[in-house]
């Protein structure tokens, strides 16, 4: 079985760890160098423990030093790190111009461990710094020479330290080195600090402080970002910016920086107490296999494969995660099949057992559901005699056992087709889709808010509907009354006819207008009196 059979998983990495004997600022505990190394390893063991605490289980470290990989080699040769640390990467740190505060900009070169033996020739001897018209490389001998050129009274160790401190190459010299060696570039991940102290931001601040216009530094800043692969920063604002999710769009970040960039972060430990403990618990989580190629994959998917957070990203409850399954059948391997807690895909050619595997996995967990869906989909799949499914919470499902303590959704082949053929307004497809959508926090929150809004507006809406129905009823009654009375035109014609009859009869009976008026008044008075008597 492969060592990392589950695929990419979130694990803690710390790519910026100095060791005892580091070329600058060694503050590890112990009077002698061997004592400091012993205390260093003990601190690591104490921190990681048995590895059960995921927030303290470090899978990869970048052994960091200024212009040297000697301490990296010592760590590899001594083999005293916990077994949980699967990958150790050489991280060469140096300063480059332009200046950031009192030093150059902090830049790191993380090398593929496979090319460590080549670095003396292809990297250290090719680095270039000029002092007093003489070119110096970054080999130990040349750094000692540089130190002595600066102060001839120094012994070799002191001269070496002096040379390391003063060796500050230019961005152009570094760019040329890697441009001339494609193999070296392919096996190197270059990371620059964005700190306001020793990073690109610090250099920009210095430029402004000495009277320059900050925009005049843009070309230099962008040249640095275009040269590197990633950023060393625990600042959430930096992480958003270099993903194109802040002041600049993704296209604009790519234009300025060459690509979207991941932000890594490390403890930058120079003391025992600082090991694996960056400020504010800004731990670096990376989703990949602990390998150099796994780390390189982050460069292509920076948004999905790295997080700076105190807690593991996307962590699920153990009772929601299938850990593995074991099949006891002569046609299958007896080795456990391990699952990723995010996404597992069953890949294979036709008739290689994909449906059998999925069917028996579901059948072992929820037999009733599987049998009902198989009946509807009209499919037949081979049933294996003995299967065990192991959950991350320790629960075990076995073939034939009735156990519905864990919920799954099983969708056999042709099942959705069968549901689609049903002439019903709502089918199980709707429930399946809704359940999947509701797994998204934003969708679920929006749905819950919508239901709340409906509940809040319902009384007002009900009243408006009632009023509309009442008014409509009144209108219908009025229309019915009008229909019984008759149309307006007919009534007007009838009035005209009655008026004509009145005029005719008045003439025939010699009734004067005054008599008619008195008669109308009497009728009106009589009507009033009858109303009063009632």
In which residue ranges do the predicted regions lie?
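Charged catalytic cores and adjacent phosphate/nucleic-acid-binding surfaces used
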Residues: 1-57, 70-89, 94-126, 195-351
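Phosphate-binding glycine-rich loops of NTP-binding sites
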Residues: 61-62, 113, 340-373
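Nucleotide-cofactor and metal-assisted catalytic machinery
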Residues: 65
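Flexible, acidic/histidine-containing loops and adjacent segments that form or flank the divalent-metal
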Residues: 93-168
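Hydrophobic, aromatic-enriched interface-forming segments
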Residues: 143-213
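Short beta-strand-centered segment that lines the nucleotide-binding/catalytic pocket of NTP-utilizing
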Residues: 368-384
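P-loop NTPase motor core
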Residues: 379-455
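Long, non-membrane, amphipathic alpha-helices that form coiled-coils
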Residues: 440-534
